[in-house]
Amino acid sequence: METKENIVLFDFDGTLIHADSFLKFARKVCGLPRFCCVMLVHLPMLVMMCLRLTPRDVAKQRLFSAFFKGMDVERFRQLGRDFAQDVDGWIRRAVYECAQDARKQGKDVYVVTASIEDWVRPWCEKQGFLCVGTRAEVDAGGHLTGLFVGRNCRADEKVRRISEMLPKPRSCYHVLAYGDSEGDRELLAWADEGILISCL
């Protein structure tokens, strides 16, 4: 019997780190006054989201547009690289050590996240992790449109994206996955071993 290749998947926000990286990044980039103004304007929508009357993906895209639409993509990516320096302060140590142990054992470690790749990937590259996340759309002039390329990378989209990225059929892998929320359940179910983080 052929030995299966081991891969390990981690959610980012709430799993590898304690923080919500979207809000942390938006606050850092936009400054506190503008951040608070945008959040206040969108408060009714956020309440509707919490009541499950507005889809989470719709709310996220509208917030992303309010914060970043029209920004030069190279500036956005540089801000993402700068942001990577902040992430270490929010690490969930026990989970992070699991990821590093897997990498040291020669396993491919993927961070599969609903957060935007441009601010997660730079940190992942520093750690030796691969990154699969939500992608920001860029117009012909090199500016953010405020939309996403494809769907927000959560729930079943996480499974679709990681399946698309793997070079071999799913049956060739033994998959261990870590997540913390409803948006990770499909990924955890797809894995051979799914670990729902609670108090690590």
What are the roles of these predicted feature ranges?
Residues 1-5, 78, 85-200:
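C-terminal cap/substrate-recognition subdomain and adjoining C-terminal extension
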Residues 1-52:
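Active-site neighborhood of HAD-like aspartate-dependent phosphohydrolases
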Residues 13, 51-52, 64-68, 87, ...:
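A general boundary/transition motif marking the beginning of the first structured unit of a protein
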Residues 27-30, 81, 149:
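A broad detector of the eukaryotic-type serine/threonine protein kinase catalytic domain
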Residues 32-35, 51-55, 73-75, 93-96, ...:
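Conserved alpha/beta cores of soluble small-molecule-handling proteins
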Residues 47-59, 63:
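Cysteine/selenocysteine-centered motifs that mediate thiol-based redox chemistry or coordinate metal-sulfur cofactors
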Residues 59-94:
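Metal-dependent phosphoesterase signature
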